[in-house]
Amino acid sequence: MDKYNEAIELIKNSKYLVVFTGAGISVDSGIPPFTGKGGLWTQYDPKFIEISYFYNHPLESWKEIRKIFYDFMLDSCKPNLSHKTIGDWSKQGIVKEVITQNIDNLRQAGGAKTVLEFHGTTKTLTCTSCGKKYDASKISLDKIPPKCSCGGILKPDFVFYGEGINPEVLRKSEQAILKADVILIIGTSGQVMPACQL
């Protein structure tokens, strides 16, 4: 049996299939990966999403964050066939959980039910002063940095360089991996820490 058919059989016969996705899955949706040839960090300086830089230079950070993640990624990118297939399998009960390193929300838009966003999401913003959460689609980014009703600066809810992974998401991801009898890995080299330790 060739590897393709062997993979099909493993998926068909799995009792607890977990899908683990990285940046490569969203390339067909028009989102370049962060690293490698044509990656975002060949076009933009990653310092703009370093947590210390963000706190010290929120306006400069938000200019790039808005351009990269909100003007482009969220406005024009739609789920591709891979996202939709995972969504269909999730609805059919084939895929039990999805762990994603992506922050683009395309697995959910494709229909996946249980998605653990390992590196967070662009869909929500949190006040750096009071902790209040906002739906990013309801916040105008015409004036940046966006601010909370308390006057605090809003930060996207994705993990910046220098920040830790949300402990609850890490715990649930580890549990999902332990429950899995098959893990389907799509679009990741498996080298990003700490996701590669799962």
Locate the predicted segments by residue.
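Conserved catalytic core of sirtuin-type NAD+-dependent deacylases
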Residues: M1-L198
